[in-house]
């Protein structure tokens, strides 16, 4: 069993618990508590990014386990239920946050490894990201409600990952979205 700690707890707490990567993958995929799913995904991604930075500095290629990508795919498949949550859960830790976790900050390594992970996810989940992008088109005309905002955010996140592939077809999707945008979120 994998404990899902502090479920439903609303106060800021900094609890250290040594979960294995397998535990974090399990929580990211199956935990019923949305915050714990997000937190597990962030911790798991940070673990792989920090290891990737060590590899990068040593001149080795970064390795990102398939189980992590499958967990991302699971969250993406579940995205129609709550696109705003999926957007948060599928986002990687920021370069600034990664730097805060390091003793010696290496901006080039952080940027390179984070981008490598984004490309790895995009390559492995290309079809799923494309499907999510196509099915989350916000209703026309523009509506400023929470559900529509979540759909726009998820759609843009998917497009951001897909742009890592540097394919003409994906660039065309990006340009078409910009050209037809009726709101600032979709044009940025």
Placement of each model-derived feature along the sequence:
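Long, ordered, helix-rich scaffold segments
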Residues: 1-188
